[in-house]
Amino acid sequence: GQTLRISYIGYEGQEVKWEGQALNIVLKESNNSFSEAVVIGYGVAKKNDMTGSVAAIKPDEKNKGLVVNAQDMIQGKIAGVNVTTSSGTPGAGATIRIRGGSSLNASNDPLIVIDGLAMDNQGVKGLSNPLSMVNPADIESFTVLKDASATAIYGSRGSNGVIIITTKKGRKGAQLKVSYNGSMSVNQKRRVQEVMSGDQFVEFVKTYYGEGSDAYKALGVMEDGKQKFYNTDWQNEIYRTALSFDNNVTVTGSVKNVPFRASVGATNQEGILRTSDFNRYTASLNVNPSLLDDHLKVNLSAKYMFAKTVYADGGAMGAALGMDPTKPVRTADPRFKNFGGYYQWLQEGSVLKDSKWPETKIDLATANPLSMIDMKNDVAKSNAFVGNLELDYQVHGLKDLRLHMNIGADVSGGRQDTEISPASGTNTYYGYSGWEKINKYNLSY
């Protein structure tokens, strides 16, 4: 005889042995089918029973690799949800719109709920949005509430839609398991703007202005009494091949009837623009026992994140297109000692009345792009903690009556320090030093 397997979406599959006889098979409805059950504000409901517009997805297996922010996992996956990355900076956040914007003046950001805790959309330094603090490897599912029914659960905060994130948890009776997941990615610039090389620029000036012109004499630099032309590719100087790494260690198991899951993660993402960098370290703990004959479900979760973001001077990208390609990146000429050896367009600096600075950079001239990057130190460090206790009690004797309680805390803070050297072409002589700090404390119950 042959063994037949009969299955259908939303039902439990069956295997039966067939030896030529007629079969009458009835499939049992599955209560564990993810496509049939969605997480909403007050618990879990069958998708067929929902009257509002709800989309539920699991992270796509095709997205395996380095995914830095949670918003990258839903980009292009849910109808009516538009995710636009704010910039190419490592660890950058994104603008999320559900069915477009609804206000010209007020915020159009959707409410983000992580394991039952509604998050404040106000970011801190180095932490672009609440999704940045969640390790993508810890996410079990996304549920998006799109229409006005979301306000019935979350009030006016849900008027722009709601994104509910459920993180992974332990399973009752599971054996202790330790797992590791790591990935590496290589990023390169896709293309650069086409500009003249140093040789082409020299030929252009020679053809249209002549070798005796001031424009021709301004090309290159004087070395040993001779005019020397360089062939500097400024775009190549400021961009790099970026390596990124992601490592995660997870411990899952169950102590008697108390399942748990703990994880730590480390992400390092280099930016294509030199010196830009993003480092994030996360830790999470989920304990989810069921008590009183499974009538009382407890979910205790805690998440911590530390992030360090190094911002490069984005103005260097424009400067790389406008800087003279016949000039060197650095020079041993003592005139440029005050500029760290980087070539700059100079003028008499008598206005400073400082004998140590006989020359300064011409204000209207293009600054050395590499100097703009190397002479600026812009670092943001942020910490975030989210803790939540969720209790769901099904009243004995009344299976349709549930009591739900949620209490949580969202504590985060970030500080950004910016320092620009006096040798920089953007803040010559004076330099710059400053910092900005933002702390956030929210208690929800």
Regions found by a protein language model. Give the residues of each.
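Short glycine-enriched loops at secondary-structure junctions
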Residues: G43, S355, G408-V411
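Proline-rich low-complexity regions
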Residues: P110-L111, A118, P325, P334, ...
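Small-side-chain secondary-structure face that scaffolds active or pore-lining regions
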Residues: Q193, I272-S284, H295, S301-M305, ...
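Asparagine-centered polar/low-complexity signal
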Residues: N160, N286, T366-N368, Y445
